[in-house]
């Protein structure tokens, strides 16, 4: 554990950062974030990466913003494992930096948003133990960008059973729900954790009165719509049309979609209803939408979300939105790199890998 803590560095407490009061330092924070955004990989990078092997890609990112992460972890990991850990470490440290350079309401909202990584980690830990994954495989997927430190997550990953993990989370807000986990209802628990996260996030936002909270709320509502739409596509393609099977999987608080209206529609009518929404432009150009792969559809929806964030950022340049734009674009970059590494390790074709990438 000492080695891991040394590699990752000591993590600042998130609890002390969550202050609603105080002055938000928008101008300073946005200026810093613009500099950070300029270091994101340009879209021209991805075709080049697809033509490289794993070792070449690792060397490439070692010469980029991920250099320190690769260098720090190179003594412990190699190949794809090194890349996974370096990407996750970089993402966590990047988000920690955002919390250090923000204050007041701005800091409070960002911290609330980043709690999604605690949800991600809890789901990863449960899934890993349920399917007997090795401790190393579990660690490879953990991202300490929420309140849980990497040291704490490492201790959880080393537990022998999922029940021991749940017991170790007794003091968290997730514990009452996790007590319902019986080893056979993972999908239910994961969905409820997601719903719990968004419910808590909307509670943190409260009734948005300030311009920043209104922008932030709209941003999250758009994200909820995109997530619900992805779920609806999966269910509709599977032939699920019963409201009592679909509605429990929907997240409340979306911007435009009416899941209760879409739930019972057959696939063709579902598509017709989508033509009336802002999301149609995102998927209208998908060839053979009725038979297109879910991967392509979901990639288009994520792309729309990213592009919308950029549009919001241009409309409100000195606000929380440019920072949120950077957060999701940074996450997307890490996801893209992870997809390429995993695809290369699995010997997937460049076409299959490319279909999963979201490149802006």
From Swiss-Prot:
Instruction: Please report which protein family the annotation says this sequence is part of.
Output: Belongs to the V-ATPase V0D/AC39 subunit family.
> What is one process in the GO biological process aspect for this record?
proton motive force-driven plasma membrane ATP synthesis
Q: How does it sit in the membrane?
A: Peripheral membrane protein
Q: Which Pfam families does the record cross-reference, listed alphabetically? A: vATP-synt_AC39
Q: Tell me how this protein assembles.
A: Has multiple subunits with at least A(3), B(3), C, D, E, F, H, I and proteolipid K(x).
Q: Quote the NCBIfam families the UniProt record gives.
A: AhaC, PRK01198.1-4
- Name of protein: A-type ATP synthase subunit C
- Which regions are flagged for Basic residues bias? 9-22
Q: Which domain of life is it from?
A: Archaea
Checking PANTHER family in the record gives: V-TYPE ATP SYNTHASE SUBUNIT C
The Gene Ontology CC terms held by the record are: plasma membrane; proton-transporting V-type ATPase, V0 domain
What is this protein's function? Component of the A-type ATP synthase that produces ATP from ADP in the presence of a proton gradient across the membrane.
Where is this chain's protein located in or outside the cell? Cell membrane
* Alphabetically ordered keywords of this record: ATP synthesis, Cell membrane, Hydrogen ion transport, Ion transport, Membrane, Transport
- SUPFAM superfamilies referenced in this protein's UniProt entry, alphabetically: V-type ATP synthase subunit C (SSF103486)
**Source organism of the structure:** Methanosarcina acetivorans (strain ATCC 35395 / DSM 2834 / JCM 12185 / C2A)
UniProt xrefs under InterPro entries = ATPase_csu/dsu_sf (IPR036079), ATPase_V0-cplx_csu (IPR014272), ATPase_V0-cplx_csu/dsu (IPR002843), V-ATPase_V0D/AC39_subunit (IPR050873), V-type_ATPase_csu/dsu (IPR035067), V-type_ATPase_csu/dsu_dom_3 (IPR044911)
Specify where the region named Disordered lies, as residue ranges: 1-23
Its Gene Ontology molecular function terms?
Answer: ATP binding; proton-transporting ATP synthase activity, rotational mechanism; proton-transporting ATPase activity, rotational mechanism
């Amino acid at each position: 554990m000492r080695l891991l803590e040394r590699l990752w560095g000591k993590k600042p407490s998130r609890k002390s950062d969550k202050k609603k009061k105080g002055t938000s330092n928008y101008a300073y924070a946005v200026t810093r974030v613009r500099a950070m955004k300029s270091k994101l990989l340009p879209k021209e990078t991805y075709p080049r990466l697809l033509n490289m092997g794993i070792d070449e890609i690792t060397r490439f990112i070692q010469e980029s913003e991920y250099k320190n992460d690769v260098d720090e972890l190179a003594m412990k990991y190699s190949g794809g494992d090194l890349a996974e850990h370096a990407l996750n470490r970089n993402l966590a440290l990047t988000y920690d930096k955002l919390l250090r350079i923000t204050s007041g309401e701005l800091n409070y909202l960002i911290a609330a948003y980043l709690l999604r990584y605690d949800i991600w980690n809890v789901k990863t830990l449960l899934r890993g133990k349920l399917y007997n994954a090795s401790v190393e495989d579990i660690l490879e997927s953990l991202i300490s960008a929420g309140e849980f430190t990497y040291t704490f997550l490492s201790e959880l990953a080393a537990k022998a059973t999922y029940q021991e993990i749940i017991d170790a989370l007794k003091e968290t807000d997730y514990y009452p729900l996790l007590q319902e986990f019986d080893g056979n209802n993972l999908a239910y628990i994961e969905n409820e954790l997601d719903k719990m996260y968004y419910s808590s996030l909307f509670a943190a936002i409260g009734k948005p009165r300030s311009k920043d909270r209104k922008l932030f709320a709209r941003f999250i509502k758009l994200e909820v719509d995109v997530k619900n739409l992805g779920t609806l596509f999966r269910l509709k393609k599977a032939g699920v049309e019963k409201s009592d099977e679909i509605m429990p999987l929907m997240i409340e608080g979306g911007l435009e979609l009416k899941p209760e209206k879409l739930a019972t529609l057959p696939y063709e009518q579902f598509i017709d209803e989508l033509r009336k929404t802002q999301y149609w432009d995102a998927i209208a150009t998908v060839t053979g939408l009725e038979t297109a792969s879910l991967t392509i559809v979901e990639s288009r929806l994520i792309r729309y979300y990213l592009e919308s964030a950029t549009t919001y950022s241009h409309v409100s340049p000195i606000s929380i939105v440019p920072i949120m734009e950077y957060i999701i674009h940074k996450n997307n970059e890490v996801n893209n790199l992870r997809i390429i590494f995993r695809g290369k390790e699995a010997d997937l074709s460049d076409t299959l890998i490319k279909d999963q990438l979201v490149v802006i």
